Amino acid sequence: MEIKEEHKEICGSIATCQENNRSFTLKNATDFIKVKIDGAVFPNGDKTVRCDYLFFNEKEQERIIEIFVELKGKDVEKAIKQLEQSIEMFAQSNRRYAFAVATNVSTQFNTLIQKKTKEFKQKKHTDLKVRSKAVQCNYHTDTNTLSISQ
């Protein structure tokens, strides 16, 4: 699915998105574009299942890395489904990450998270990370990879 220019925001050295005490921060984000999917690409009220944000960088109109982000309350399973759908609609790069940032990640979801993490890697070629409340990542330009700050 094509993303209109009006929905793209050029990032500075630090890019963030936040919602109801949940946040995602990307450091060294100078070459990234931030897209608000839920509420912009798909207006509020649209029933399409989708994640909240997509970050990507590109070189010569080709995406190098994509980061899908869902900021969710408690329903981790729904967050994962939203990420899956968004990857199917928007993925263009072979290097992808997906983050579900929930209010509280219960230990009852450990088995589901492990299963989905493995499934994402095999079927979607995407690294899935599920975290509580806040995530900070660093982008490494030399390897086009992310590391999660602890």
Give residue spans per PLM region.
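Outer-membrane beta-barrel translocator/channel fold
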Residues: 106-124, 133-148
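A cross-taxonomic marker for long C-terminal extensions/tails that follow the last structured domain
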Residues: 1-12, 16, 130-150
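Nucleic-acid nuclease catalytic cores
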Residues: 76, 90-116
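Acidic-basic catalytic patches of nuclease active cores, encompassing PD-(D/E)XK
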Residues: 1-45
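Active-site-adjacent loop/helix micro-motif of nuclease/hydrolase catalytic cores
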Residues: 45-46, 64, 75-83, 109-113
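Conserved catalytic cores of phosphodiester-cleaving nucleases, focusing on short active-site segments
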Residues: 53-55, 65-73
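Histidine-anchored nucleotide/phosphate-binding helix
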Residues: 81-91
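A short, structured beta-strand/loop element
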Residues: 48-58
